[in-house]
Amino acid sequence: VVLIHGWGMHGGIWSELLPALEGYETRLTPDLPGHGGAPCPDGRYGLDEITAALAPEVPAGATVLGWSLGAMVAMNLARRHARRVSRLILVSATPRFTNSDGWDCGIADGVFDLFARTLVSDYRQTLNRFLSLQVRGSATSRSTLRLLRSVLFARGEPQQAALAGGLEILRHADLRAWLGEIRQPAHVIAGLRDRLVPPAASRALAAALPAGRFTELPEAGHAPFVSHRTEFISALSAPAATEAPA
């Protein structure tokens, strides 16, 4: 299994979850380019470039679990490197983060505009504000925020170019046009209290994926594998018959 983290974080975010995945012979937690210990490539920092950089670290036939921005990368891996991905687990996932014509399951553009304005002057404060948004609404918001903040810079600080490029993906990427090309089984897991990716977006994503299915965690926010680990682990192994229809 390959676990792909979200914007501003690194692969260490999965450390508490890994023991529950002992059924997998290999458990990989790569850093996205420019995050943790991974170098940041020169030139454009877009979804395709991130995917190309990460693809060599994904063994053939892997289960790929992606969270938030990492879920977008996971879906692009499944599309462009289909032989490497046998199954997707998409956590707090959406095909588009912001609202647009024909898509009202996102959040207002202004949220990411504010992050973009403050990123240059104080990226640490920007990242901490982003963490606060991630836990907002969760029943365990305070303890979850403490844990996320304790992990944030554990592998070093992310590079500015990676933060800026990743934020542009969050603001503008729209995967809806090619979701039908993803043929691998895809399990979409969402927290009902997520304020960054509304559950309606994750439900719509599951419905748009040819082999998608959907599970909702009622008390969780944007980081359910941190805030509600027991429920999240149960959801990973839940049979399709017990899950909410997409």
Show where each model-derived region lies.
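Conserved HGGG/HGGXW glycine-rich cap/lid loop of the alpha/beta-hydrolase fold
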Residues: 1-43, 47
